[in-house]
Structure formats: C-alpha cells, structure tokens
Amino acid sequence: MANSIVSLAGDQVLAVAQADATKVYRDLSTYRIQLALEEDGWHVDYELKDPRLKGGGPHYIIDAQTVAIISKRYEQ
C-alpha cells in the first residue's frame, strides 16, 4: 500500500512539474526526467538526453505533502 501511495504522489508531482516546464520549454521530448523523493521533498530534474548538446532543463523541488513547487531553476 505504501508503494502505491508513493507512486500516486510521484505521478502527481510529475504532472505539476510537467505543467510548469511545458510553459517555459514547450517541447520536453529532448529531456530525460529523473524523479527522486528526498528529505526536503520530491526532486524532479530534466536532463538533456544527448550529452553533446549544451544547456539543460528545469529542476524542481516539490513539497511531498502539498505537491506545491518549493523551488525551481531553469537552465537554457
């Protein structure tokens, strides 16, 4: 049961991050998404799939209880 709660929360967190990231980056298909639950909340990191490309994607910390964005940083 605890695993499905974390899974559900992970899906919600990803939806929040993706909604914000799409506004800024539009096309997210060139990014690999990393999602990890840490002590300070969910960390969602968009990293370029192609290591030869310069720049990067958005990075979020999202509250594990409220699913609100605590911090975000954009790389271009």
Model-predicted regions and their roles:
Residues 1-32:
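Short, non-transmembrane alpha-helical segments in secretory-pathway proteins
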